[in-house]
Amino acid sequence: MNRQIIVNNTYGEKRIAILEDRKLVELHVMHSEEGNCLSNIYSGIIRRVLPGMQSAFVEFGGTRTGFIHANDLKLNITYEEYQKNLESDDDEDAGSEDQSQETQSEPRKHTDITEYAKEGNRILVQVVKEPIGQKGAKLTTHISLAGRYCVLLPTITHIGVSRRINDREKRDELKEFGQKVLKKGYGIILRTLAAETDIKTIEKEVVFLIKKWISIQNTFQKGRGTALIEPALDPMLDFVQNTAMNELSEIVVDNKNDEKAVRDYFAFYGENPDDKVKFYDLPYPIFDYYSIEPEVTKLVKKKIWLKSGGFLIIEQTEALTVIDVNTGKFVGKGDLESTVVKTNCEAAEEIAYHLRLRNLAGIIVVDFIDMRNQANKKKVIAKLEHELEKDPAKCTVFYFTRLGLIQITRKRTTESNISSLTEPCPYCSGNGIIRSRETVTFQIFREIKKHVKLYGSRVLTVQAHPETIFALEQKYSGEFEKLKKELRISVKTESDNSLHRESFSVEGK
């Protein structure tokens, strides 16, 4: 697999596109006025303790307070507890890199928030989940510092080695190195890329991360109030950090500062970036040149056509995402069950692709086309799970419910691309629908009757949108005339293009 990272930086908006074998698989959009707070480390102040919820609200410098659970304040926790804390939010599975457990598990103990949190206390926190919708950022006091080859855990005693490292000898070598780090009082997770380098290089990174941690502590101790202590790695560099060099074919940027940042990053690890890093200065916009812009435009569409002629409908709500699978134009050449299975398998591949591309997370419910054969159901599940393995975020698939629905959970850390690229429609206030002309017309009829009965009006004026006036005077002219005759009134109508389709006024004399 060849991976390309294409970065478009334009006056306050940075867009990062990840292409695998020239196909867009991820898009990340950041706006300078909003900022990207995921993994940032802050000096925070506890503003409100909620014993009933075993949690607290923390002011940390964001636009609203963050949320921290008692277990994220607790001292001397095990790695298992740390993982459970990450997994506990919204009943979603954690999306961290797979790694083996090298320490013994301990039962999770009950934690009393009042033992660790007092209003006004200043604490060092890290954002583990960005604000999404009405929810504030999720915070923890258990800081993790990620590098290219390892993750340093300053507050947790743990050695972990990525499960993706299969070489037994290499695993033993990395665990032995981890023991040395553990003796210094730090936990460590050796990442997948650690298998591709030597211990000396990993040791250099560990020394760098320990120095960073000491600097963070010193800055926190000297400071007062809320403040950003340590910004997270630029998302652009984060993607570089998580990509093996033999898989990264190129990183193309259209901003000189971004080019310097990438070159400096490679230089730190002693790697020559000349054949990987490219500065784009052609007249065409960079996303147009790489055929990314048309794909970005499609991201907000609900309907996705499958190659066979079937289609998906993706509906994102506050609570969950619903995906409906339909055969559409596809009629197949065999029996109905074969047609359905083929459409469902094709849909499974496309669903996994769009969960990652659109960054849809939390609870996802899929309504596949009904299948009678259990073997066919297992085939579709297997296809879905296989395709989801390509996703860096942790996904869990649950078998068909009694209603024939598939449930998926995908770890959420940032908002979806639909949320990043769109805003609620100002015309319908985000409902996606407005009252029909017919409904508004009959509302006007009722309002006219009310005016006559309450105020004794005999001459009235109705102001409304032109389409509503058309419905009054044309489509329902008979009913309108009957109403005027019955009430013995005269009604003047006035069209106003500036009015909302649902708005109208009735005034009487």
Regions found by a protein language model. Give the residues of each.
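Metal-dependent catalytic core segments for phosphate chemistry
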Residues: 69, 264-294, 298-345
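Charged, low-complexity terminal tails
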Residues: 1-139
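Phosphate-interacting basic helix/loop segments used at nucleotide- and nucleic-acid interfaces
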Residues: 29, 34-53, 103-131, 171-174, ...
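A short alpha->loop->secondary-structure connector
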Residues: 75, 134-150, 169, 267-275
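Charged, low-complexity intrinsically disordered tails
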Residues: 159-293, 300, 414-509
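Conserved glycine-centered short motifs in functionally critical loops
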Residues: 53-56, 60, 64, 130-153, ...
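Gly-rich Lys/Arg/Thr-decorated short loops/hinges at beta-loop-alpha junctions or inter-strand turns
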Residues: 22, 156-158, 220-223, 331-332
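Active-site phosphate-binding and catalytic loops of NTP-dependent enzymes
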Residues: 2-5, 25-37, 108-115, 132-139, ...
